[in-house]
Amino acid sequence: MTRGNELHEAVKRSLERYFKDMDGEQPTAIYDMVLKNIEKPMIETVLGHAEGNQSRAAEMLGINRNTLRKKMQQLRIKG
């Protein structure tokens, strides 16, 4: 299994658990919930691997450095 597939399966398992925990209730705003729960740890982890270098982290993420800085501010990630 490739790393992308592992991540895919982890997200899928988490969502299946989430639906099970909802016990038949209709969830809303799942897309935003997933992004909010994935985006911050993803950026923090990539920044760690980039040794705090925001330009390198942005390149690793495939986003513009200014976009990274904006997301860091929004998510209250210190840099």
Task: Describe the residue ranges of each PLM region.
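Bacterial C-terminal helix-turn-helix
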Residues: T2-E6, R13-G79
